[in-house]
Amino acid sequence: MSSTPKQTTGDALAGHTPMMQQYLRLKAEAGPLLLFYRMGDFYEMFYEDAERAARLLNLTLTKRGNSNGTPIPMAGIPVHAMEQYLARLVALGESVAICEQIGDPAAAKGPVERRIVRIVTPGTLTDEALLPAKADRALAAVCVTGKREPRAGLAWLNLASGAFHVTECAPGQLESELHRIAPAELIQAESAELHMAFEGARTRVPDWHFEADGARAQLLAHFKTDSLGGFDVEDMPAAVCAAGALLRYAARTQSQALAHVQTIAAERPGQYVLLDPVTRRNLELTQTLSGEESPTLFSLLDGCRTPMGSRLLRRWLHHPLRENEPVLARQHAIATMLTVRQEGEQAFAAAGLLETLRDALNAFPDIERIAARVALRSVRPRELASLRDALVALPALHASLAPLSGSPRARELAAQLAMPPDIGELLARAVASEPAVAIRDGGVIAAGFDSELDELRALATDGGDFLVQLEARERERTGIGNLRVEFNRVHGFYIEVSKGQTDKVPEDYRRRQTLKNAERYITPELKTWEDRVLSAQDRSLAREKWLYEQLLDALAQYVRPLSQCASALAELDTLAALAEHARRHDWVAPELIDGAEIDIEAGRHPVVERAIERFTPNGCRLDQTRRMLLITGPNMGGKSTYMRQVALIALLARTGSFVPATRARVGRLDRIFTRIGAADDLAGGRSTFMMEMTEAAAILAASTPASLVLMDEIGRGTSTYDGLALAWAIAYRLLTHNRALTLFATHYFELTRLPAEQPTAANVHLAAAESAGGIVFLHEVREGPASRSYGIQVAQRAGVPAAVIRQASRELERLEAQGAPTPQLGLFAAALDADVQSQAMTEQAEDAAALAQLRDQLAAIDPDSLTPREALDALYRLKQHLT
């Protein structure tokens, strides 16, 4: 049963104290959100909020008096520990309304004035302590419009940086788009029914937030413009609806306008190489198949020196580009960094430009997020100090980029680093060299910045001389040699006299505190001075807070250039990290062409090669005359690694990175598909085979001649003949209809006949060799089909009992003998005469049985335990069995 009163007006509030009435009004405003209600040094929660918070945060649940005759549940957290509790709540998908005291307790006649100043939700985090340093945390909104031809509008905002994006797609693509963006929170209309998987928090808002006119008006008002034409979104009505609703929600959570959100970036179909959720997972771009952060492609490449660079690298890996021009610009910048390093020894000594640049980047904080917090007025003093120091280092970094002028992109980035000198000068004058953590602690504004503050500080802190003089005068006046003038936070200033000297105390001394061995007094002169000092401390802190607010006002005009500078620093950092990785590991610049083609010479898997001592390079050629590679070979032979390797090299090439190969040529791709591995979707009621077919259906429906498709052992989840038939039909469809660039791994050797019918298909295999010790995987891709699968040898290496291996070998021989005249390829070719087939099967079955019996007898003999006579007898028996 709910312990919270259901109404907050009229008679419902009459039975509550004024403070609780205030709380209930604010709680009604917060709605279902947890309300952190500031009371002194604690945030308190009451009623259901207290019970919920106590359960989620493991807090002690207490009571605070009675209201309407019922004890009020209460739980609280210290103000200084708020961030750690917020982080835990947000991780659990909770949202919290922060209510602060905004009135002066000393001047308040009733409850101190309070107001909800901020709402913290999973998608609206801006505090450094709550955000992952190397990943974005976006807030998204979705709106589906139209009945005859529905369109899904999607908007997403990174509140910690101000980046605001929109796009439109078919409703069926919405889940894939959300997986690409990976927002922490999704806003949708109350009546909207979105049947799709989404792991983040969902928030419903009134339908009218998504109405076209209101959403458009919200955007026009925010950007202070009469038209959205300048943002290139006029032809995206569903996206505009989503963007307006999102901006309204985000502004409400911050209780202010979002000054750092200064533009909308419209993303169009065809801008990126599309990767569906299955492909992102299978390629392990930023998360392993087991959910770990390492080893992944991102963890391998992330040598960035700033959090901004790491986040940009993550975005690049998830958003490979289709068009060659921007990719080539990045690639050229990386090549220039490497070339200057090799040839620019005179300018940069032995270290080289690349090392100099990367070392310089170490000095830069997360300017992207600091700029956002300046706009939101939540920036901390020490962040401003780090920004000040970064601006001091910026001119030297800018000058060091001069040798990169051969790269147009590097020149553009260098130009973006230029900052107005005023901001650096302002921060240098205003912020103390080592400011306090929070403005409430004082010591943030630098000495000399404000004369009034300097006077108050002097009055509050430089009273040492006065106290020394007062103590000397009082000792002389009273004749008390051990008299002391001291201070503590509880009783303020006092004169302490030992018990044995109290008879010498003058009449103007007033007792302040009695101790066991001493008395403490105050005099009119000391009281007057105490009032001045304590008043000066309060006024000093108030003045400093006011000056800090004025400083934030002055810094607001620099948010845009700060954001541009941060963007340039992030890209320079990312490019330098990719250049350093290419230099260390012998990666090369791929050739980018317009046609759909992949030609790799001696390619390597970027992650696997770093995990093993020796990696075998392999090439791959897919072009107009060679659309599909049918890949056969043993289990553990490296088929899946090879396929992923090709996809990762293609993806890296489309991000602008160098690639692990001796030579590579990669064309314009529109999508990358993968069908690798097997997994059940138990919650969705789909078996392994159903999942396999669902993924295959998506590939057949969407792949084009410009797509790269990876299909691994399709059809293995059902019976042999069903699986073979499906694998053949799917491969044939991909080859003749979709015409996608396809890597098709299979254990169905019957499929290796496909190139005989379709010349644009080719056979390759992962080589293996048998030795006395068993099978040896060569991990080398060779032309032509494999001769066998070596499944039993792999099982033997895995530790399957010898008896099972022997029985499996006999069964394999029997099956091969039976199936030799009528291989499964008979599904697609004419069968032999039935009588001839039957006779051959009978003869081979008899031979196989005799051979199996002989093998069993031989395996049962232990030569070491036989006498010479017994060994000779055994040999005769075996010989007789053969005849």
From Swiss-Prot:
SUPFAM superfamilies: DNA repair protein MutS, domain I, DNA repair protein MutS, domain II, DNA repair protein MutS, domain III, P-loop containing nucleoside triphosphate hydrolases
An annotated GO cellular component: cytosol
Name of the protein: DNA mismatch repair protein MutS
GO process terms (BP): mismatch repair
Gene3D superfamilies attached to this UniProt entry: 1.10.1420.10, 6.10.140.430, DNA repair protein MutS, domain I, MutS, connector domain, P-loop containing nucleotide triphosphate hydrolases
Record function comment: This protein is involved in the repair of mismatches in DNA. It is possible that it carries out the mismatch recognition step. This protein has a weak ATPase activity.
A Pfam family that the UniProt record links to this protein: MutS_III
Lineage of source species: Bacteria, Pseudomonadati, Pseudomonadota, Betaproteobacteria, Burkholderiales
Alphabetical UniProt keywords: ATP-binding, DNA damage, DNA repair, DNA-binding, Nucleotide-binding
GO molecular-function terms, A-Z: ATP binding; ATP-dependent DNA damage sensor activity; damaged DNA binding; mismatched DNA binding
InterPro entries reported in the protein's UniProt record: DNA_mismatch_repair_MutS, DNA_mismatch_repair_MutS-lik_N, DNA_mismatch_repair_MutS/MSH, DNA_mismatch_repair_MutS_C, DNA_mismatch_repair_MutS_clamp, DNA_mismatch_repair_MutS_core, DNA_mismatch_repair_MutS_N, DNA_mismatch_repair_MutS_sf
The keyword Nucleotide-binding is assigned to this record: yes
The gene coding this protein: mutS
Record-linked SMART domains: MUTSac, MUTSd
Organism: Bordetella parapertussis (strain 12822 / ATCC BAA-587 / NCTC 13253)
Family of this protein: Belongs to the DNA mismatch repair MutS family.
UniProt-annotated binding residues for ATP: G633, P634, N635, M636, G637, G638, K639, S640
